[in-house]
Swiss-Prot record:
Reversibly transfers an adenylyl group from ATP to 4'-phosphopantetheine, yielding dephospho-CoA (dPCoA) and pyrophosphate. Pathway: Cofactor biosynthesis; coenzyme A biosynthesis; CoA from (R)-pantothenate: step 4/5. It is found in: Cytoplasm. This is Phosphopantetheine adenylyltransferase.
Length: 178
């Protein structure tokens, strides 16, 4: 390749449970889409977790939020659902980068270990970490769900559409518990 010819940016895959998608996730998505030509948001169907929302509901919420982004950003983002080993998903999508967001040191330890395991599986796939915006560092889907369950204010943590969907889901869950 000629030194002056433009280098093609790799395809990146941003995996997660996104139960629900938070402003922190959306920040990583926006920033990742600025860095990579194509960003695939991969919504995990994780048998080890009991999500509040189905994988299709989670993907739908992400698609809704992406539709609100400006072009060309939103045209470079795709949302998929996967239920396989992450590295199999990465390879099947033609991605060469796994994008991950980091909030704190505890995230780093876990993500570093995962990146190491993924490197052992396929050393051609790189993991790129983006630090969470300092305002969004404490935001975690798990905590947002807990706050919503106790009727707390979740508007600083998730977009309005997700607030509505989360309130509906919590109401359904509470009605089943009664």
């Amino acid at each position: 390749m000629d030194a002056l010819s433009p280098k093609k940016q790799p395809i990146a895959l941003y995996p997660g449970t996104f139960d629900p998608v938070t402003l922190g996730h959306l920040d990583i998505i926006r920033r990742g889409a600025r860095i990579f030509d194509h960003l695939i948001i991969a919504v995990a169907e994780n048998p080890g977790k009991s999500p509040l929302f189905s994988s299709e509901e989670r993907a739908s919420m992400i698609r809704h939020e992406i539709s609100r982004l400006e072009n060309p950003t939103k045209s470079r983002i795709e949302v998929i659902i996967y239920n396989s080993l992450l590295m199999d998903c990465v390879e099947s999508q033609g991605a060469s980068v796994i994008l991950r967001g980091l909030r704190a040191v505890a995230d780093f330890e876990y993500e570093y270990q995962m990146a190491g395991m993924n490197q052992q599986i396929n050393n051609k796939i790189e993991t790129v970490f983006l630090m969470a915006d300092s305002v969004l560092q404490p935001v975690a889907s798990r905590l947002v769900k807990e706050i919503a369950f106790y009727n707390g204010n979740i508007t600083p943590f998730v977009p309005p559409y997700v607030v509505q969907k989360l309130q509906e889901a919590v109401t359904r869950k509470k009605s089943f518990q009664d």
